[in-house]
Amino acid sequence: TLTEFQGGPQEIAAMASGDIDISQIGHGAHALCIEGQAKIFHLDCTSLADAVVANTEKGINSIADLKGKTIAVSSGTSAEIILNLALSSAGLTQDDVTLVEMDANGMVSAMVSGGVDACATGSPSTLTIANALGDKALTLATNNDYVDQVTFPSSFITTEEFANANHDVLVRFSRALLKAQD
């Protein structure tokens, strides 16, 4: 059964409660694996899914134009890192903008309704926003802009208990992933 989550911490909590056995996490949740809350069993890829997206109708045509604007972000995510790198590239910091804490679904709604001027989020939200705003959507920065500075790994994880009891399942799962990528 496939279950969708808003982020890695929620996935790891669902594993800890026994609701799911395996999950795929992005960059930020790897810290929880380092803390021992989950076990990485398959490195998936490096992510290029994050972006800072702005609405040009809000007077934003460059990263520098974010100064004084309201930006939706989910703290602790790789998208927030991209936002910080983008701001820095224009000589700005988070102190120069108004940040609004929001999950990915909220960002889509806020961008479409005009409730925020820009957002830092990942796919598929970036695509949904671009489709909804059309020509008014402007991607200001992505992971690709900073690959020489930071890498965002994605991995498949499980609990230590599931890994110990189901080694063969994890091997078959990993082999299936590799075969699908071939």
Please report, for each region that a protein language model flagged, where it lies by residue.
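Extracytoplasmic/periplasmic, Sec-exported soluble proteins
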Residues: T3-G7, I22, D44, N55-K58, ...
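Pocket-flanking alpha-helical
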Residues: Q6-K39, D50-A64, A79-A86, N105-A110, ...
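Short helix-loop capping/hinge motifs at secondary-structure junctions, enriched
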Residues: T56-D65, L92-Q94, E161-L170
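Pocket-lining segment of extracytoplasmic ligand-binding domains
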Residues: G28-A29, V100, N105-D182
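A structural signal for short loop-to-beta-strand junctions that line the ligand-binding cleft
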Residues: Q37-C45, K69-I71, L138-V147
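Short loop->beta-strand "edge-of-pocket" segments that line small-molecule binding or catalytic clefts
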Residues: A64-G76, R175, K179-Q181
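A local structural motif
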Residues: T1-E4, D19-D21, Q37, S88-M102, ...
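Residues that flank catalytic or metal-binding motifs in active/ligand-binding sites
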Residues: L48, K67, F152-S154
